[in-house]
Design a protein with these regions (language model features):
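Signature of the first transmembrane helix
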Residues: 14-75, 79, 243-263
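Small-residue-rich hydrophobic transmembrane alpha-helices
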Residues: 50-110, 147-166, 273-337, 370-392
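Hydrophobic transmembrane alpha-helices of multi-pass small-molecule transporters
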Residues: 62-65, 109, 177-182, 207-211, ...
Length: 452
């Protein structure tokens, strides 16, 4: 039997650290097969193919970010009911979230597949990479149900305090993805489409195995027929939280789309540099994202248990870990950015290497801003204030749009490099007072309940 874990008692730092580690390893593995995708495509198919895969990165983030946000949102009521030990309602939430996932993922897959070509044209994708970008993006969209369930099941399991089980299945998915990448690209010669097929298929296999394992091993999830029925009241709660979290990712991605569209207009070398730099950056951001995800579960459970003071302890502990990590990462990327870029492109591609290095040097200088963003945003989401988290995404969107419209045409690629850091700062300026407001309100709620 798999075990769940309560985070409502004990020192915050070791609890969060130990919960973060499996999430971190999982996110690193996820980024590893993203790196492998790009490395195999770049090394064996050339920089045009690498640019094809990267030309739609922000669009993929827009669509899949919405799906992943919904999945994370669906896990919040589960974590809250688990923290409150209301296991019957918790099981009902799990059942309804799975039912909603079926409908939502199929509808999104159909809609995005139909408009795939139009999306790439809107992105000003260069003609010489359009065909490869279309093949890659279409397969990714068709595979959205696999991605949706892949993330939803992880969110549910994490809500129960178990961050290890999703990691084990992610190991399987990563190994399978790498093998299929090599087979589809080198043996079958399917090019960019083969890279997408490998990713979607490996996620589908992992999602299926997670589902089987979850219901066989977690006794706490085995519900009665009544608990497994669709309940509109619970569905409204899930959609209210999930859609708002999904929109937060999508709103953020709109700014990213504008930024990438502006970058696409700068030519293939800039697209290839942006692609390789983003893959490297996302790899090094995994600990910050994992720390934020841990805080969502930590804050959700302690909110459900009526212990807001532990949420503040969690903020302090996670911020300390974030500062240490970002300092180390700054040294690594300032010294080794070009070496990491060589994973994707040949040494002869001097322009691409230099632009990749420039992007990484600027980004890593602002990692503490992103670290604070992750901690505060996920904490606010964990206690159910998803509207505020969504508004922070609006701040990011506005910053990226302003950079795209005014700075990139005037200053070129270096302005693209500053797009994300400006967005992180804008979000922090909103999130810091937002968290103070939420925390004070939670404390008042506890005091009111105690008096009553």
């Amino acid at each position: 039997m798999a075990t769940s874990k309560e985070m409502t008692a004990g020192p915050a730092l070791p609890l969060i650290f130990n919960f973060t580690l499996p999430l971190l390893f999982g996110n690193l593995l996820q980024q590893t097969y993203s790196l492998v995708d790009a490395a195999i495509v770049g090394k064996f198919l050339g920089i045009n193919a690498l640019a094809s895969v990267g030309a739609s990165t922000s669009v993929v983030f827009l669509i899949l970010g919405f799906c992943n946000g919904c999945c994370g949102g669906f896990g919040i009521p589960v974590a809250q009911k688990f923290g409150a030990r209301d296991y019957s309602t918790m099981r009902s939430y799990v059942s309804v979230s799975l039912q909603l996932a079926v409908v939502m993922s199929v509808v999104i897959a159909i809609f995005t597949s139909i408009y795939c070509a139009d999306i790439l044209k809107m992105m000003r994708t260069p003609e010489n990479i359009f065909e490869g970008a279309y093949a890659y993006l279409l397969v990714t969209f068709i595979g959205i149900p696999c991605t949706f369930f892949y993330n939803l099941l992880s969110s549910i399991i994490r809500a129960l305090g178990d961050s290890k089980t999703p990691f084990y299945f992610l190991v399987l998915a990563t190994v399978l993805n790498i093998i299929l990448d090599l087979f589809c690209i080198l043996v079958l010669g399917w090019g960019e489409m083969g890279a997408a097929i490998a990713t979607v298929f490996s996620q589908g296999v992992s999602a299926f195995l997670r589902y089987v394992y979850m219901y066989r091993k977690f006794d706490i999830l085995r519900g009665t027929p009544k608990e497994r029925k669709y309940q509109s009241k619970l569905a409204k709660t899930l959609l209210s939280i999930g859609v708002r979290m999904g929109l937060q990712f999508s709103i953020t991605a709109i700014g990213s789309i504008m930024l990438q569209s502006a970058n696409n207009a700068l030519g293939t070398a800039c697209v290839a540099a942006f692609t390789s730099a983003m893959r490297i950056k996302m790899f090094f951001l995994c600990p910050l994202e994992s720390l934020g995800m841990a805080m969502a579960t930590f804050s959700g459970q302690n909110y459900g248990a009526g212990k807001p003071e532990r949420i503040w302890s969690g903020i302090k502990a996670s911020t300390l870990m974030m500062v240490i990590y970002t300092a180390v990462t700054f040294l690594i990327l300032m010294l080794g950015a070009k070496s990491f870029a060589l994973i994707f492109v040949d040494p002869s591609e001097i322009e691409v290497l230099e632009k990749t290095e420039l992007f990484l040097h600027i980004s890593v200088s602002f990692f503490p801003m992103l670290g604070l963003l992750c901690i505060l945003r996920y904490t606010i989401q964990g206690v159910g204030y998803t509207n505020l988290a969504m508004f922070s995404g609006v701040s990011e969107m506005i910053a990226r749009i302003l950079v795209s419209i005014y700075a990139v045409p005037a200053f070129g690629f270096i302005a693209v490099c500053y797009g994300d850091p400006m967005a992180w700062i804008a979000a922090d300026l909103f999130l810091i007072p937002a968290f103070i407001y939420v925390y004070r309100r939670l404390k008042r709620q506890v005091l009111t309940s105690a008096v009553a």
